[in-house]
Amino acid sequence: MAIRCEKFVVSGIVQGVGFRYHTSHQGLKLNLVGYAKNLYNGDVEVIACGEPPKIEEFAKWLEQGPKTARVDELKREEITCREYQGFEIL
């Protein structure tokens, strides 16, 4: 199956609530690679690469996030795949 990479930008109460940790855990659980990092404006940027059905499942999870977060908006776009090791928290 082809590998797809997507960039997600998650807005809401997503910093200081363990969002990146839970996102990394969920990504690894779905056999995805990539990263989650805080942005200066309070959003979280997530890059995820893997099988398309797993990316879709991950996107559905990101729409809700962990119980400690409040996701107001999720933007996504397909990007060129790069080599990532694991699912990092940056």
Swiss-Prot record:
According to its UniProt record, what is one Pfam family this protein matches?
Answer: Acylphosphatase
Stretches assigned to the Acylphosphatase-like domain: 5-90
Q: Which GO terms describe its molecular function?
A: acylphosphatase activity
Q: What is its EC number?
A: 3.6.1.7
Question: What cystine linkages occur within this chain?
Answer: none
Q: Which residues form the active site?
A: R20, N38
Q: Which UniProt keywords apply?
A: Hydrolase
User: Which reaction(s) does its UniProt entry say it catalyses?
Assistant: an acyl phosphate + H2O = a carboxylate + phosphate + H(+)
Annotated InterPro entries = Acylphosphatase, Acylphosphatase-like_dom, Acylphosphatase-like_dom_sf, Acylphosphatase_CS
Name the family. Belongs to the acylphosphatase family.
Give the protein's recorded name: Acylphosphatase
* Naturally occurring in which organism (per UniProt): Vibrio vulnificus (strain YJ016)
Gene it is expressed from? acyP
